[in-house]
Amino acid sequence: VAELRSAYLITGTDRPKVTRALRRLRDRVGQEATEHLSANEASGEDAAAACNALGLFTVERRLVVVEDVESWKTADVKAVDEYLKGPAPTTVLALVGPGVKRDSALAKAVAKAGEVLVYDLPTRGRGNKADLPKWVEQQFHERGIQVDHDAARALVELVGEDAQELATEVDK
């Protein structure tokens, strides 16, 4: 099993894969050792303070998850960057934001101390429009089920373009 890094930025348009990546992290650290924050209410300083805080119970590892980090301002990113220069050794910081770009200051800061995980839906053509039928085919394939392109396209037409809804239908 690979060693956990100090920080992860989990981003991308493939919301189900982002959710699965976060679940895998939580499973490795433990649900009881996980603290959730929202960037809409918590600043970068708040996130750093949560990482540095000692938990009520002594645990081997802690996970601090901050959702919606694409809403953070420059000062928040700087606070996290400062924290990541000397991160708490027993804490894993997971920053989640579907709109965070790979070349953003936040992604660069996390890349120095941890790992940037980008899960995007496949695109087609120059318009960067998501190729959802292809994505649906991949989802079925990952579950050991073969479907043709027409069936995948029909599912997208029936369910719509929400990847989370499509993933739910594939799981059925």
Regions found by a protein language model. Name each.
Residues 1-172:
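Conserved beta/loop motifs at nucleotide-recognition and modification sites
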